[in-house]
A protein has these predicted regions:
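Non-catalytic cap/lid and distal C-terminal segments of serine-dependent acyl enzymes
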Residues: 1-191
């Protein structure tokens, strides 16, 4: 099982060409083939997931749909607004969802874990296209979090800090995400 986690490639929205940067080329066309060759990493899309946080979540939404040949599952942890398959001016324009709807329905497992940000419009678009997805909204009630939770503001425990990757992957929602990834990928049986 391989999990690609796009993170911190500032100003690119995970597309080649933005600000002269090449995240798609660097990671998917250079690094991934290198890892496959050097470390016997699988090239089987059924054993690959793309998962990201915040802008990396936007990247996972984009790469998951654009590169169906590379990934069987995409997980977006607290993706921000601005994701659209129909508005080319949107911050995170992902036309693949409108162009490859049937292929996405059949071959991409999609999970959205929401903390502080909002994907309501993107979820409405997925519903319109009848693209299935798994959705989790982190609890709004502060009492839902234990004192040691990464979801609490350490300077003021009466406040939540939901927009952080540690919060997104802890507790039952974190366990559910790893379970989702395992179900979304198909591991080869050990011989």
């Amino acid at each position: 099982l391989i999990v690609i986690f796009p993170e911190k490639y500032g100003g690119t929205v995970w597309r080649d060409g933005a600000e002269g940067k090449r995240p798609e080329t660097n990671i998917l066309k250079e690094l991934l083939p290198y890892l496959e060759k050097q470390y016997a990493v699988t090239g089987d899309r059924r054993q690959r997931t793309v998962m990201g946080f915040s802008m990396g979540a936007a990247g996972s939404i984009y790469w998951g749909a654009k590169y169906l040949d590379l990934f069987s599952a995409a997980v977006a942890l607290d993706a921000g607004g601005g994701t659209s398959f129909s508005d080319p001016k949107a911050r995170n324009y992902v036309p693949e969802y409108g162009k490859k709807t049937e292929a996405i329905r059949k071959s991409l497992k999609l999970r959205l874990v929401q903390g502080a940000l909002n994907t309501r419009k993107f979820r409405e678009s997925l519903n319109t296209l009848k693209i299935p997805y798994d959705y989790v909204q982190l609890p709004r009630d502060i009492s839902a979090y234990p004192a040691e939770s990464s979801c609490l503001n350490k300077k003021d425990l009466t406040k939540k800090f939901l927009h952080n990757p540690a919060c997104m992957t802890e507790g039952k929602w974190g366990e559910q995400t790893w379970s989702f990834i395992e179900k979304g990928t198909h591991r080869k049986e050990k011989q």
